Amino acid sequence: MSSPAEYYKSLPPISKAYGTLCFFTTVLVRLHILNPLFLYLYYPRVFKKFEVWRIFTSFFFLGPFSINFGIRLLMIARYGVMLEKGAFDKRTADFLWMMIFGAISLLVLSVIPQLNTYVLGLPMVSMLVYVWSRENPNAQINIYGILQLKAFYLPWVMLLLDVIFGSPLMPGLLGIMVGHLYYYFAVLHPLATGKNYLKTPKWVHKIVARFRIGMQANAPVRAPANGNAGTGAFRGRSYRLNQ
């Protein structure tokens, strides 16, 4: 059995970075180094007080230490990691672009009063779970050892459990909406029409190549000398649509 350090080292880069930032954000809140009120997305303060950091920090706060926090962190460690290692294997730039698209979509939807939510880390996790469930619809999932179901239904079951345990409905619902928006334009629409409107931009490929983050076998730009390059088998329907 691998040690915790070896397990952490084996995690794919984007999921590892996102989960780590979420964990340490909550640690800093717990130590009273960060005030959670300064992390929330609150547009009046963003535009009137120029507190632009809220646009970013709201994605890395999953709430205080609690069972719900632990569950969401485990979702990143499980479903985010499986998605990045599975359908997005050797496609780091594409995975990063999915996260960026999700973040932008959540920021836009949060402008609508009826959809407004102050902590965007929660819908971001729901988005990852939704996309994974669409890429692996027939995988068997065991919920708390008492319920077994196909992965396709996982986001909706988790949404129901959130409501049962007293969490707000909107964050999870927003994540499902944005996840479906991504999956429709990145997978379903290209399959139907042959046109992919969500092809990963070159500037995202350049970021991955410049900082040598993970691997991108179908990259339109070259990594720096000594950078990792590779080819191999790809899993998941999304890959074939991003070439």
Swiss-Prot record:
Residues 1-20, 76-94, 177-243 are cytoplasmic. GO terms for molecular function: signal recognition particle binding. It is a multi-pass membrane protein. It comes from the Eukaryota. GO terms for biological process: endoplasmic reticulum unfolded protein response; ERAD pathway. Induction: By endoplasmic reticulum stress. The keyword Membrane applies. SUPFAM superfamilies: Rhomboid-like. Pfam families: DER1. The chain crosses the membrane at residues 21-41, 55-75, 95-115, 156-176. Residues 42-54, 116-155 are lumenal. The keyword Cell inner membrane does not apply. InterPro entries: DER1, Rhomboid-like_sf. Signal peptide: none annotated. Keywords: Endoplasmic reticulum, Membrane, Stress response, Transmembrane, Transmembrane helix. GO terms for cellular component: endoplasmic reticulum membrane. It is found in: Endoplasmic reticulum membrane. Expressed in roots and endosperm. Belongs to the derlin family. May be involved in the degradation process of specific misfolded endoplasmic reticulum (ER) luminal proteins. Associated with ER-derived protein bodies in endosperm. This is Derlin-1.2. It comes from Zea mays. The gene is DER1.2.
